[in-house]
Structure formats: structure tokens, C-alpha cells
Amino acid sequence: MIGLVGKKVGMTRIFTEDGVSIPVTVIEIEANRVTQVKGLENDGYTAIQVTTGAKKASRVTKPAAGHFAKAGVEAGRGLWEFRTAEGAEFTVGQSINVDIFADVKKVDVTGTSKGKGFAGTVKRWNFRTQDATHGNSLSHRVPGSIGQNQTPGKVFKGKKMAGQLGNERVTVQSLDVVRVDAERNLLLVKGAVPGATGSDLIVKPAVKA
């Protein structure tokens, strides 16, 4: 089953009939419009390309404008692709709505995490701090040794060090679907999802469900 592109509206909570409070993230999923259908013959795999939302005509590049015009679809705020099973029937210009999640119990949500700027190893990688006293001065939050000796004579790739924290693609798996509001194009999932309010999210049925 394909996924959909939505926008993070924010977090709130809803109550069950027993009065239990459930923290939920509200995701607005406007109709996803199919802009291209890819097939085995021409592309080597099967997929659909979709767009959602709207973008000012002055902000759409000429190649993108031609692509949208060819599909007969209003220019959206981006293009996303979802792989499809062979034999799945989709047509260019078709709209796919949030109600495809009506029978789905768990979803995977992908977004871009909030950027935190340059961060040290304690904040970024949960390193322990060094001694506050006992002869330690000026080295309380430094990482310590980052290598060995003349052999190997280098710092290994992937070594956990200070640097940019956040602002990367993150997927949270197996979030419970609490409610599907097809009238208002809303999907409520239990818990938090990556990214800032207003950021784009990709919602797919959970692979581990």
C-alpha cells in the first residue's frame, strides 16, 4: 500500500470514553494528486509521483510548470514518489485522500527533525561528562581520546564527535492511528512525530504492523 504526504499541524490530546488522556499529533493530509505513473517498460519499476498543497505560479520553475501542465494538475509544494505493486491501477490527475488509512491501525511517519545547530558530544551522543574536580580543569565536557596510536594513525570514519545536530531525515515507526477525519483531511496518531509545526511528513502503513 502506498503512503501519503501531509503537514504537521501540532500536538493535542483526546480522551477515551473511560477518561484516559491520549497524546496525539494532528497531521493534515490534503488530497495527494498523481502527477506521474511510472511503469516497468519505461522506468524499470512501478511507482506513482504525487504532489499536494499549492504553490504560487511565480515560485514554480519552468521545467516544473511544464511537468504539472502535462499532467493537468495544479502545481503543489513539492513532488514525492511512492513505489507501487505491479498491476496497481493509478491514473495521472487522480486524487488520493486520507480515507485510505481508514482500516490501517499503525503507521510509519517520516519527516525532517528540528535542527539544533552545532552541538557537543554530551548533547549530541549522550557522552558522560568527565570529573568535575579531582585535578580536572577545562576538560569537563570534552570527548576525550578520539584515536589510538601510530597504528592506525587516523580517526575512523563515523567516530562520534561534535557537530550538526538534527535537521536530518527521521522515521518513527509503528505509531497507533487514533482517528481518521476524512471531512477535515486530518489523521491523528498517538505520540510525537519528527519535525517542526508546518513541516512536510510522509505517512505510510507500518512495515512492522
Swiss-Prot record:
Family from the record: Belongs to the universal ribosomal protein uL3 family.
Keywords of the record: Methylation, Ribonucleoprotein, Ribosomal protein, RNA-binding, rRNA-binding
Entry annotated with the keyword Zinc: no
Signal peptide interval: none
Gene Ontology BP annotations: translation
Function: One of the primary rRNA binding proteins, it binds directly near the 3'-end of the 23S rRNA, where it nucleates assembly of the 50S subunit.
PROSITE patterns, alphabetized: RIBOSOMAL_L3 (PS00474)
Residues modified to N5-methylglutamine: Q150
Keyword rRNA-binding in record: yes
Species annotation: Erwinia tasmaniensis (strain DSM 17950 / CFBP 7177 / CIP 109463 / NCPPB 4357 / Et1/99)
Protein name stated in the entry: Large ribosomal subunit protein uL3
Subunit structure: Part of the 50S ribosomal subunit. Forms a cluster with proteins L14 and L19.
One Pfam family per UniProt: Ribosomal_L3
Residue ranges, annotated region (Disordered): 132-153
Gene Ontology CC: cytosolic large ribosomal subunit
Free-text description of this protein's post-translational modifications in UniProt: Methylated by PrmB.
InterPro entries for the chain: Ribosomal_uL3 (IPR000597), Ribosomal_uL3_bac/org-type (IPR019927), Ribosomal_uL3_CS (IPR019926), Transl_B-barrel_sf (IPR009000)
SUPFAM superfamilies with a match to the protein in the record: Translation proteins
GO terms assigned for molecular function: rRNA binding; structural constituent of ribosome
